[in-house]
Amino acid sequence: MSITYAQLDHLNLSRLDHAITAWRAVVRKMREIDDSHGPKAQKPFEAAGWTTTGAGPDTAAMAHKQIKDAGHEADSALKQARAIEKVLTEARDSLKAQQKRLHDYVQETSAGGKVRISNQGTVTFTDSVADDPELQGQPGFGQAVAAEQRRIDEIEGEIRKILQTVTEVDDSAAAALRYNVGNDKHGFNEHATGSTEKAEDRYDAARAVQLAQKGEDMSNSELKEFNSLLKEHKKDPEFSERFATRMGGRGTLEFWEGMGLHDEPAPEGARKELLEQTRSQLGATIGTATQSDSKAMQDWKNDVIAAGPYALDHDLNKPRGFQVMSDLMNSGRYDSAFLKDYGNALISYEKDATKNGDSLSDEYLGKVIPGSGLDGGDIDLTNDWGTDPMAGYMNALGHNHEASTEFFSNKSNFDYAMGGEGVKGARDWPEDAYPQYDSGKSRGYDALGHALESATTGSDYGAAKPELHRGEDERAVMQRVMERYGNPEMELMDKQTGISDSMGRMGAAYIDDLNYSISGLDASDQRQRGMEELFGAKDENRIEPVTAQQFVRELGNDETSHGIMSQAQQAFTTSRIQAHEGTAEAYRAAEWGMTMHGALDEARAEQIGREYREGDEDYNHELAKSAAWKQAGVSVAVGGATTGVEAAATILAPQAAPFVIPIAEAAGTAVETGLGNEIADSLKESERDSTGKAINSIDGFDYEAKGLARTGIDNYMNSHGVEGPSRDARNTALDAAYARGGRITDTDNSR
């Protein structure tokens, strides 16, 4: 309950002072009892050497236990009394400080008599401009009234802040006292704590468990309270561990399965929305709990993994433990060791389940076996969940880049998850049967993409501030990705619907290496040609030129990855032009950027030609869309402050996940703000929508696409006053570079 202005203004703390004095006396008495128990009771008893002989009950042992228990109770009583006294003292001191803060503020504000504050905390002016009839209608009257109102809002806002602080102090103290007093009517609370914050956390954890025990019988208001508790404490290690261990591993799974989000029919309206929030907050809370290496949490982890292969409650129409746990793993950051153990168990289970030719779809969605019942009827083994646990697991890897890099560094894991034609033992990804929370689309390949992004960039997917850490392990995983997804025989990007955006962002993160590697297609010595300096790349990180060429072609084929890579290439080219400003290398960087754009656009045009007939409305529409990739903005994040983190520009794409591109720093110096502005200006100028234009030929596509691609160098030439024949010569060279790029990815001229 919120504390009112009048309550704080007139707060009398004398009763609280008396309570503190009384509890201090209790502490003294409990200390005397606790101190005297050992020397006056336990030690004399032990020294007496009393033993029991004969066949009767061991009276001596029973007495010894009672003496020991009494000592434990005395110790618990002292601990509880100290905790209560400390909580009361902290609360009294905080309330006194906030009351003084209020009185001082009111006195300062009311000085001069112009401002009046009522017992309800309402602020008025004693001589308000608004009440003066002579001023009404005069010039500036409206502005004066508005200024008064702003001052009133400011004062009332400060008072509300003070009252909010007091309410939080009161609530925290109440929760701490409830926890410290405990519910045991026959003993003392041995876990009592004098820390108000810690006691409140423990009370909240107990309350969350109490609500969870109601399961699906929780009302919407109780479910809202449960969600709020988890949201408040989801990053609190102690709360999370206490909640998880008191629920137990299997208990956690049974609770979430029983809440009914995936029931058929599915919940609707407010209940569905609340349950989706529960899934997110519970997953995040459990993720924090797994970071603990205590024995209790290790038992929890072992229980969850052990329950993974089996249907809950031995009911074959219920989901398997892996399905339930992985559903929660879509949110939160899980411990690396737990993810490794969980993933090994999940893959082992899947391989065992499919070794005789059964499919994962049947395993996770269930199936009906006709005519196999005892009465000759069908056996229905379907379950309402129908979710693929590997999808949730992949999202969990995506949120922990160390774990994802380790997972995909294992070739067996890589092959199993990625698959591809000719790859033995690869996983056959099933579609979710009931993806109520994802617009009816399978989440498997989308989640796989998130895990791969994390593994190759060294940054958690969805991080508030994406970073770029391309160490040896991350680069090795990216090399495998390029080889597998660039293989034209496998056509993985076409087959794995939902992964193309992740592939585009991964390509963007290695845009410097891709530029450098493709420059070596002519087998020339790239170092002698100065390509390292041109791109800010290192020869030691070079990808095989043909691998880079094939990967860029596959990225260019897809509309989504083509758009992301086009944005990334333009931003990267602009950064390299800026890095070489005032030298001939600036134009060389621009020409190479046009070459890369030409390669991407040729691949996209060919794919459109394969899918649509030239001249058809759909053909024209696809050309227009691909020629009109948009960009919302860019921010520059400078690496170097954190060991191993590279300088990178974070590209903020509209209605999509941001992506990062590498920017080389000269001698460790920070990227200049001007570089970020230059990239941002180039991207904003390319923000256009050509879908309304009649692009009905490949020439029209080339014209529009080239116009976007050259924005950075056009800005550069404008700022340097390059005009006339010199400008014409530069433009001719840029067009020629774009054409050369087209030849890099030209395969069958499906244009």
Regions found by a protein language model. Give the residues of each.
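Intrinsic-disorder/low-complexity coil detector
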Residues: 21, 38, 43, 132, ...
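Gly/Ala-rich hydrophobic membrane-inserting helices
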Residues: 652-682
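Alpha-helical rod/repeat scaffolding segments in eukaryotic adaptors/tethers
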Residues: 56, 60-63, 67, 74, ...
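Non-catalytic all-alpha helical scaffold/repeat segments
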Residues: 183-646, 665-672, 676, 690-740
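Compositionally biased amphipathic helical and low-complexity segments enriched in hydrophobic
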Residues: 12-14, 535, 653, 661
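N-terminal secretion-targeting helices of virulence/extracellular proteins
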Residues: 1-182, 744-751
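Short hydrophobic membrane-inserting alpha-helices and related fusion/pore-forming segments
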Residues: 57, 638-663
